[in-house]
Regions:
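Acidic, surface-exposed loops and disordered segments
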Residues: 3-227
Length: 227
């Protein structure tokens, strides 16, 4: 690591092996559990993740209750094999109705230190222009929810990468019935379905067997330089 006055940075040679090691894990060792310290670190990476206009339109449900996990099995086919073996399971929620003029967005503005009424008004005007004119997010409730859902994937990636850096395996999960997942977790009292909706899930633990090498397209096929 290279020390600076502010923090410690790492070299590509130190980081790339963790990216190469990280593969979607579908077979966890049930006898190995992630320590509280290590999992709090993973959650902190999620909390510190960036989001559009600093909105932080997410919540992280850590599903450890065995009975609740069993209730997910009939419709969570993407993680049915790991519900009993994953050390930790996180379901990430996205905010509903995060309009530029909603109390949720206004709270975010104030949290970032913008409290002057005139400054708040100018910020809201920028948000309105972005949501209404630039990205057309106000076309429907779904487009606005999907915008918040996109932000959760930033946190998701940071959690998985940060886990890999300390030798913890993971697997992102979209393979479930969203209506049933929302209903089951809401009925368990995990969230208000009028305010939040399930975006994506992720499992964490330690692999119980070797995982086949990942297949990736060559850089020349996915990167275009505009010079």
């Amino acid at each position: 690591p290279k020390e600076t006055a502010m923090t410690t940075f790492f070299t590509p040679a130190q980081i790339l092996p963790a990216y190469q090691y990280r593969k979607s894990c579908r077979h966890y060792d049930p006898s190995r559990k992630i320590s509280a310290e290590d999992f709090n670190y993973i959650l902190e990476l999620a909390r510190l993740s960036p989001s559009s206009v600093g909105s932080e339109p997410w919540r992280f449900l850590v599903v450890q209750n065995p009975e609740l996990r069993q209730k997910l099995k009939p419709f969570a086919w993407g993680m049915a094999a790991t519900l009993d073996t994953a050390s930790h399971i996180v379901v990430i929620l996205a905010k509903k109705n995060a309009r530029y003029d909603s109390p949720f967005m206004l709270d975010g503005i104030k949290r970032r230190g913008i409290t002057d009424p005139e400054a708040i008004g100018k910020t809201l005007a920028k948000y309105r222009s972005f949501q209404a004119d630039d990205a057309h997010l106000l076309d429907s409730e779904r487009t606005l929810f999907d915008w918040c859902g996109k932000q959760t994937y930033i946190a998701l990636a940071n959690m998985m990468t940060g886990a890999a850096l300390i030798g913890i395996d993971s697997c992102p999960i979209e393979g479930f019935n969203y209506d049933e997942m929302n209903r089951t977790l809401a009925e368990a009292g995990a969230f208000d379905p009028a305010e939040w909706g399930v975006s994506v899930a992720v499992t964490f633990g330690y692999r119980s067997q070797d995982i086949a090498p990942k297949a990736r397209k060559p850089a020349a096929e996915v990167v275009t330089w505009l010079e």
